């Protein structure tokens, strides 16, 4: 079994989740931060459950100049502004937390 030692080898894919009351501007707010930081959206899924938005994004930070910690802070601030919770984590952490 090969162990991945560097961030470059592990990849720069992240999972972003957005949960909260649906309103105008949520997707624009999240994707605006990603675009401004050269973070590419690889996949996106959203649904409205009654009045609540549930959105999951898979994104690639390979070309971004900011680190994941800074991105988390930026997204969290935007979430507070929009009245939703926005979380971001490395793909490996997400897989570990949601394994069966």
Language-model-derived ranges and their functions:
Residues 1-100:
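A conserved regulatory-domain signal marking ACT and ACT-like small-molecule sensing domains
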